Amino acid sequence: MEVDAERGRVVTGWGTVAAWVAGALAFAVVVFVLAGAERVWGLFGPADLGDIKFETLERRSSPNDALAMPEGFGAARLDMTNPVYAVPPQALRDAFGRALAGEKRLFRVAEDEVALTARYVQRTALLGFPDTIVVRFVAVGPERSSIALYSRSKFGYSDLGANKERLERWLVVLAREVPPVK
């Protein structure tokens, strides 16, 4: 510690600043661990980002979302085109529910039986960041259906591909329940 004799005050160096920053960071980590991720992120509003309309969806400018839909279903830029399944939409919805049974940190927050839509929140493993996933089951012909999926992060500019990986994983486990026809 140095004292500035002319001004009569203590001069702090970078070591003191670094100590304060380290202390503040340690305090934040302790609060995060003790309070839990859900409570901490809850301070920034609900985890669920709400519903969307696939037909009029406008994608985010940041790379922290992913969209997968049947061919010709909407105008937004797709990350992947979803296949067609040889079952009606209700049966596809039931198979989807079975397929997701093993997903960790996944919570259904809304469901519309008539519109055949559902909304989920899934939290990341390490820090518990919430992502909202909207699902819609659509008829694409007699006894044929497909699925529209939109996954988006609540926090951050980039998700490092996590939302797209989630949708790809979900489509793989759904195909084990109901094999696609095309």
Where are these regions (language model features)?
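Ser/Thr-rich, low-complexity intrinsically disordered terminal regions
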Residues: 3-23, 31-182
